């Protein structure tokens, strides 16, 4: 039987992803708006003690500036209500604007909002605010996660806020940065993997060369981000790269290559990914599971946030 996207998802089935992450996000989403906002605030304060968060790029903040000015112009009660509306996914102009932003703009918005709260320009979480028992349990779970898993939980928590009227709504993303100059690129090497397609995938993504990167995929190829359904088709995958993968640093370490049915090849690579938000402070433990067609094009690649560092050495089928 020829591979389908669904059957391709089953390659290297023993890869153990960090299922605690989507479980924690689901528990977070069930909290009331006040607890969600307070938990985000407490978690970011806690992370700030041990991690250096990079300031968002000017392009991201320019696109969020009007919304931030709008909130600053409100009274304290209105400010609190506006933030609660975001958490409640209320149908308001601000929530619709927020939902149209790419994840990086949303992260930049909350980063700047946190600064404004610290500076007294936006109503802070009330002093002495007591989290509910459920919220305290979620916070305790987050505190027990590895730093890369903490980042993923908090990122997804704010990315899912706002109000989306429909799938075809307007999308706003920061400008795509130009690809790194070819002469200044550093090529990766992967212990156990010499496949040119996989190596070029890593190199082009590290260089923000998304137009070259997407040509490694088949026309009906798919990419599955952590804890999400596959994104199918070159146009959709390219949009994902441009909106969510700018300035990532992929550090693949080792891998294994195996033949699959119908002349396909399956390759698993493990390593780390650093984000522009935390740089070298945090390396998320990642597995890439590639399925290449007989012509060497990417039919499917899954990106898994691993359950623990020991999974970096797990290549069992």
Swiss-Prot record:
<protein>
    <recommendedName>
        <fullName>Orange carotenoid-binding protein</fullName>
    </recommendedName>
</protein>
<feature type="binding site" description="only in form RCP">
    <location>
        <begin position="80"/>
        <end position="83"/>
    </location>
    <ligand>
        <name>echinenone</name>
    </ligand>
</feature>
<keyword id="KW-0472">Membrane</keyword>
<dbReference type="GO" id="GO:0031404">
    <property type="term" value="F:chloride ion binding"/>
</dbReference>
<dbReference type="InterPro" id="IPR015233">
    <property type="entry name" value="Orange_carotenoid-bd_N"/>
</dbReference>
<feature type="binding site" description="in forms OCP and RCP">
    <location>
        <begin position="37"/>
        <end position="44"/>
    </location>
    <ligand>
        <name>echinenone</name>
    </ligand>
</feature>
<feature type="binding site" description="only in form OCP">
    <location>
        <position position="288"/>
    </location>
    <ligand>
        <name>echinenone</name>
    </ligand>
</feature>
<dbReference type="Pfam" id="PF09150">
    <property type="entry name" value="Carot_N"/>
</dbReference>
<feature type="binding site" description="in forms OCP and RCP">
    <location>
        <begin position="107"/>
        <end position="117"/>
    </location>
    <ligand>
        <name>echinenone</name>
    </ligand>
</feature>
<feature type="binding site" description="only in form RCP">
    <location>
        <begin position="125"/>
        <end position="129"/>
    </location>
    <ligand>
        <name>echinenone</name>
    </ligand>
</feature>
<feature type="domain" description="OCP N-terminal">
    <location>
        <begin position="18"/>
        <end position="169"/>
    </location>
</feature>
<dbReference type="Pfam" id="PF02136">
    <property type="entry name" value="NTF2"/>
</dbReference>
<dbReference type="InterPro" id="IPR002075">
    <property type="entry name" value="NTF2_dom"/>
</dbReference>
<dbReference type="InterPro" id="IPR036917">
    <property type="entry name" value="Orange_carotenoid-bd_N_sf"/>
</dbReference>
<keyword id="KW-0157">Chromophore</keyword>
<feature type="binding site" description="only in form OCP">
    <location>
        <begin position="273"/>
        <end position="284"/>
    </location>
    <ligand>
        <name>echinenone</name>
    </ligand>
</feature>
<comment type="similarity">
    <text>Belongs to the orange carotenoid-binding protein family.</text>
</comment>
<keyword id="KW-0042">Antenna complex</keyword>
<keyword id="KW-0793">Thylakoid</keyword>
<keyword id="KW-0716">Sensory transduction</keyword>
<feature type="binding site" description="only in form RCP">
    <location>
        <begin position="34"/>
        <end position="38"/>
    </location>
    <ligand>
        <name>echinenone</name>
    </ligand>
</feature>
<keyword id="KW-0600">Photoreceptor protein</keyword>
<feature type="binding site" description="only in form OCP">
    <location>
        <position position="201"/>
    </location>
    <ligand>
        <name>echinenone</name>
    </ligand>
</feature>
<comment type="function">
    <text>Acts as a blue-light photoreceptor and photo-protectant. Essential for inhibiting damaged induced by excess blue-green light via a process known as non-photochemical quenching (NPQ). In the dark or dim light the stable inactive form (OCP-O) is orange, upon illumination with blue-green light it converts to a metastable active red form (OCP-R), inducing energy dissipation, quenching cellular fluorescence via NPQ. One OCP-R molecule is sufficient to quench 1 phycobilisome. More OCP-R accumulates under high-light and low temperature; in the dark OCP-R spontaneously reverts to OCP-O.</text>
</comment>
<comment type="subunit">
    <text>Monomer. Interacts with the APC core of the phycobilisome (PB), probably at a ratio of 1:1 in a light-independent manner; possibly only OCP-R binds to PBs. Interacts with FRP. Detachment from PBs is accelerated by FPR.</text>
</comment>
<dbReference type="GO" id="GO:0031676">
    <property type="term" value="C:plasma membrane-derived thylakoid membrane"/>
</dbReference>
<dbReference type="InterPro" id="IPR032710">
    <property type="entry name" value="NTF2-like_dom_sf"/>
</dbReference>
<feature type="binding site" description="residues alter contact in forms OCP and RCP">
    <location>
        <begin position="151"/>
        <end position="161"/>
    </location>
    <ligand>
        <name>echinenone</name>
    </ligand>
</feature>
<dbReference type="GO" id="GO:0009881">
    <property type="term" value="F:photoreceptor activity"/>
</dbReference>
<feature type="binding site" description="only in form OCP">
    <location>
        <begin position="245"/>
        <end position="250"/>
    </location>
    <ligand>
        <name>echinenone</name>
    </ligand>
</feature>
<dbReference type="GO" id="GO:0030089">
    <property type="term" value="C:phycobilisome"/>
</dbReference>
<keyword id="KW-0675">Receptor</keyword>
<dbReference type="GO" id="GO:0016037">
    <property type="term" value="P:light absorption"/>
</dbReference>
<keyword id="KW-0605">Phycobilisome</keyword>
